[in-house]
C-alpha cells in the first residue's frame, strides 16, 4: 500500500483487496463506489477474486483496509467524527476527489475480511440507524445545493427503495429515524460549519464526480 500511494503525488488513498474470511476466493471489497441513488457499495462484492487483479481508480478507499497520505489528510481536515462507524471513508474520499485527488485500488495488498465484525450482523438497529443517518449527512455535507436539486429524483428513489426494503425486514421505523437524525445534523450549526463550500475552482471535479455517480448507478449498479 505504501508503494502504491507513493506512485503519484495526487494519490490520496489506496484500498486493499479485501477477500472474504469465509471464502478467500471471493471478494468482500475491492474499493468503494458511490452512485446517484445515494448508495455506497463495495466493488466486486461476492464475485471471484481472480477477476480483480489490476490497479484502478475508485470513488473512495474502504476504511477497513487502506492507506492515506498524511499531508493530504491534514489538508482535508481529517476524518469527520460525526460520521461515526459508517460512510466516514466515503466522506473523506469524496472530499479528496472534490480537490482533484485520486483514490486507488491495489490488488497486491490482500486482506482477509470478516464483514460486519464490529456491528455483529448484516442488519441490526445500530447499523441501520447510523448508516441511514450518515447517508443523509454525507449528501448534505458534500453536494452543493444545485447538485442536490439535480440528483433529487435519484436520491428520493434510492431512499424510498431502501425504506421499503427495511420495512420488509422489520426495521422501517429505525431507518426513518436515522434519516431524520441525518437531516437534523445537516441543519445544525455544527453540520453547517462542516459543509464543503462550493468553489468554481473545483467545478471540473464536481462535473466528473456527477458523471461518475450516474455511471455507477446505471452501469455498475442497475445493469451490471
Give short role names for the model-derived ranges.
Residues 13-15, 22, 42, 105-107, ...:
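Hydrophobic residues in well-ordered beta-strands that form the structural core
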Residues 1-39:
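Conserved donor NDP-sugar-binding/catalytic core segment of glycosyltransferases
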Residues 26-27, 39-41, 47-71, 90-92, ...:
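A recurrent flexible, glycine/aromatic-enriched loop bordering the glycosyltransferase active site
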Residues 1, 59-110:
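A short, conserved alpha-helix in the catalytic core of glycosyltransferases
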Residues 99-102, 106-124, 134, 138:
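Active-site donor/metal-binding and catalytic loop motifs
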Residues 148-224:
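Non-catalytic, C-terminal membrane-associated alpha-helical segments of glycosyltransferases
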Amino acid at each position: 500500500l505504501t508503494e502504491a500511494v507513493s506512485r503519484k503525488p495526487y494519490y490520496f488513498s489506496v484500498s486493499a483487496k479485501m477477500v472474504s474470511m469465509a471464502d478467500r476466493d471471493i471478494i468482500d471489497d475491492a474499493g468503494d463506489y458511490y452512485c446517484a441513488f445515494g448508495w455506497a457499495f463495495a466493488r466486486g462484492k461476492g464475485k471471484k477474486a481472480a477477476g480483480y487483479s489490476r490497479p484502478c481508480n475508485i470513488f473512495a478507499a474502504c476504511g477497513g483496509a487502506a492507506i492515506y497520505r498524511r499531508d493530504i489528510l491534514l489538508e482535508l481536515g481529517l476524518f469527520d467524527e460525526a460520521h461515526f462507524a459508517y460512510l466516514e471513508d466515503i466522506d473523506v474520499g469524496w472530499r479528496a476527489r472534490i480537490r482533484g485527488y485520486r483514490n486507488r485500488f491495489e490488488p497486491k495488498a490482500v486482506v482477509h475480511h470478516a464483514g460486519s465484525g464490529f456491528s455483529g450482523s448484516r442488519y441490526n438497529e445500530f447499523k441501520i440507524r447510523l448508516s441511514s443517518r450518515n447517508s443523509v449527512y454525507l449528501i448534505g455535507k458534500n453536494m452543493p445545493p444545485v447538485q442536490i436539486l439535480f440528483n433529487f429524483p435519484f436520491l428520493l428513489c434510492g431512499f424510498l427503495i431502501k425504506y421499503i426494503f427495511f420495512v420488509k425486514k422489520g426495521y422501517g421505523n429505525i431507518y426513518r429515524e436515522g434519516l431524520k437524525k441525518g437531516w437534523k445534523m445537516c441543519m445544525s450549526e455544527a453540520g453547517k460549519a462542516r459543509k464543503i463550500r462550493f468553489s468554481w475552482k473545483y467545478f471540473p471535479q464536481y462535473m466528473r464526480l456527477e458523471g461518475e455517480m450516474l455511471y455507477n448507478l446505471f452501469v455498475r449498479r442497475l445493469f451490471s
